[in-house]
Amino acid sequence: MSKINKLEHIRNIGICAHIDAGKTTTTERILYYTGKSHKIGEVHEGGATMDWMEQEQERGITITSAATTCRWQDKIINIIDTPGHVDFTIEVERSLRVLDGAVAVFDGVAGVEPQSETVWRQADKYNVPRMCFVNKMDRMGADFYRCVEMLKDRLGAKPLIIQLPIGIEENFKGIIDLVKMKAVIWKDEALGAEYFEEDIPADMKDKAEEYRAKLLDMVVELDDHVMEKYLLGEEVTAEEIKRLIRKGTISAAFYPVLCGSAFKNKGVQPLLDAVVDFLPSPIDIGIVKGMEVSTGEEKDFPISVTEPFAALAFKIMNDPFVGSLTFIRIYSGKITSGTTVINTVKNKREKIGRMLLMHANNREDVKEASAGDIVALAGLKDTTTGDTLSDIDQQVILERMEFPEPVIELAVEPKSTADQEKMGLALSRLAAEDPSFRVSTDHETGQTVIKGMGELHLEIIIDRMRREFKVEANIGAPQVAYRETITKACEIDYTHKKQSGGAGQFARVKIIFEPLKEVKDLKDEDKNKIFVFESKIIGGAVPKEYIPGVEKGLNNIRETGVIAGYPMIDFKATLVDGAFHDVDSSVLAFEIAAKAAFREGMPKGNPKLLEPIMQVEVITPDEYMGDIIGDLNSRRGQIQSMDPRGNAQVVIANVPLAEMFGYVNTLRSLSQGRAQFSMIFSHYDQVPSQVADIIKAKK
């Protein structure tokens, strides 16, 4: 297959869903039927091929997205298995960044759950075309049609039903393919590897005709010629329907909906056919956004084998056999072992050593990879998540990823002094792998503080530290990661002068600080940032080479805010004026001046304390509803909605994280163990003044 032609045959897809919707099982079945896995791995037995870290095998949840290559028909499918637990949202986010399409798996019983909404919004952010697989059709309470309604109501999505289930719950035995208008039935005794087509059962003919008409109504809108045929009563061929479903999927005009039961081996092969038929190849995506290093110009780069090499590092993993592995998605050009490329973000050269195609935890050495491929590189020295690797002669920086701020932190200390150095090394390795995990030292106590996206996230980090790096540690109680911000604009003019023999220091800066939400002409790319710096210096009042010093100073000092020492977020700093001295000015002098300007200026901006607010979903039998709502209100919660789901009630509330520690035990006693809950970070909000006073006093 020629390299150029090869791009059309690649599908880079993610399989994403809420925890327990059956995502890993679906991926396992895909690997089984595409011939990559000789034993079906069951998650609940701890044997799934994709869940290859020890903790994942024990907990039955997917933590790191393992990238796997398999083949179906004549296509290469690279699958990224993404975690469904809310604490690992960052893994989902960075997987979506490098994918061309996704399969969203939904639980046929629970429908659209909170994490499903989060993943869907993340996929919207990166414009990822996707289709939906309603799984677990064999389970008690499964309801395909209700799930489709939830796609509309909760996600605002436009579902395109291309299959209907035959039978429900334990009688689920197959599907109706609305494109071919045939029934597909699976043989249980062949582990789902054998299936056959037959005529649609008589009792489902009318329903199939009704949904086929709905399907045609939606797809013919994409092509005037086909619409004319349809309106004249002529037959629209299966090939035309497929072409239009593909067109609509790639343009996100609608989302094809399929169904099945991965665990019972039904519906997986048609899902694979749909991945190949409807999800985009790298050619359909066509371009990747980035910046030309030589000119600083933002532009769209074509995805092509013949262009210069450019790739994005989207994941770092420690492999027990190979050491550090950097997963890259190649957007253009090609690369061979032994080549030297440049990391354009760090401006460091990297020599390509071993290149590996990954199959969960098996690996295959390759000598060459090209546009569209996802490969793992061994032994890179300076590359971290979000960096670009590029051709040395034509350097580009691909669009970077934004990572969320951690919401929870705790102190760790090694159990013995001998472990001190090992712990430092372990934590820095783990932080290099995971940008949503941060490590810092508390300046007052000297303690090491780790920060992450939730209790489970930090639990797993500590677990990995113990297993992989053999470091035993004592753990403090979890603390809320508060933040600070300003609520009104303020201006400060500060001069830093130091004259004490020898070289002097001089720098003057005039900076306007303002809350981000009040900035009128904020650029689109700055809207998700927590700190924006801009220089409006004209006429050389501050020479160009000193301006990075101002930004660096502000970036460092904002980590310790002015109220209680928490990081300062959601503000813009604009350098509007300044002065320098020919001899005494330096980058360092401007860095010091910026820090002092921050310390003096920020208190004038009416600073406030912020706390993380979580979206909490509680599913409870009716009879405990009153007690649960009363308890949420007592935790400063704000009820957002209450909806019936089957014979239970679903309560969604926004509650400060500080009030949610130990909630699992309270809920258990309020509902006699019958209610369950999940929570996900929603946003930061101002802390009420009486609560803020208590927090300040503790600091």
Swiss-Prot record:
InterPro entries: EF-G-like_DII (IPR053905), EFG_II (IPR041095), EFG_III (IPR009022), EFG_III/V (IPR035647), EFG_IV (IPR047872), EFG_V (IPR035649), EFG_V-like (IPR000640), G_TR_CS (IPR031157)
Function, as annotated: Catalyzes the GTP-dependent ribosomal translocation step during translation elongation. During this step, the ribosome changes from the pre-translocational (PRE) to the post-translocational (POST) state as the newly formed A-site-bound peptidyl-tRNA and P-site-bound deacylated tRNA move to the P and E sites, respectively. Catalyzes the coordinated movement of the two tRNA molecules, the mRNA and conformational changes in the ribosome.
Keyword set includes Ligase: no
Protein name: Elongation factor G
Domain annotation tr-type G: ranges: 8-283
UniProt GO BP: ribosome disassembly
GO cellular component, one term: cytoplasm
Main location, first listed in the record: cytoplasm
GO molecular function, one term: GTPase activity
One Pfam family from the record: EFG_IV
Family stated for the protein in its record: Belongs to the TRAFAC class translation factor GTPase superfamily. Classic translation factor GTPase family. EF-G/EF-2 subfamily.
PANTHER family: RIBOSOME-RELEASING FACTOR 2, MITOCHONDRIAL, TRANSLATION ELONGATION FACTOR G-RELATED
SMART domains in the cross-refs: EFG_C (SM00838), EFG_IV (SM00889)
Organism encoding this protein: Rickettsia montanensis
Subcellular location: Cytoplasm
Binding-site list for GTP: 17-24, 81-85, 135-138
Keyword Transmembrane helix: no
Swiss-Prot/TrEMBL keywords: Cytoplasm, Elongation factor, GTP-binding, Nucleotide-binding, Protein biosynthesis
